[in-house]
């Protein structure tokens, strides 16, 4: 689940607690990754497989062993939040579709006064598209197939991935976790 604003709070209230590190600092180490965070980011760019491949190659370059952890079932305490997110995504998708129609109409007219409006609509469309992205079963299957081909390890959490990621690091089976 994560704690919203935790990094900001730590930075504001402590000194020298958060340290920036590079990939080279983790050479030869194992890192667990909350897969959904990066899948969402990569789906936003439309080239999710290519971006995931680039990420894996970067790990390989630095001889880092990544272990991707996929979310399992939704915890009871988060079901209301998930339903609210679904509603927001659906609303964003509908607004995106309306903007697409408006965009097409503006493109058809060759009025130069529309240029600013077109740019504004394109930005809104991009924002609405990003906020309507949903990880589908086919995305997960494609990614897992890619991991199998490249020998990348992955686990399926019973619940949320970040809980299993934290346990793996806490138990000393990985040195770090990539998450939000």
Give residue spans per PLM region.
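Acidic, metal-binding active-site segment of PIN/NYN-like and related structure-specific nucleases
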Residues: 165-180
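Active-site and ligand/interface coordination hotspots across diverse enzymes
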Residues: 23
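Noncatalytic, basic helical substrate-engagement surface that gates or grips nucleic-acid strands
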Residues: 2-17, 26-160, 164-168
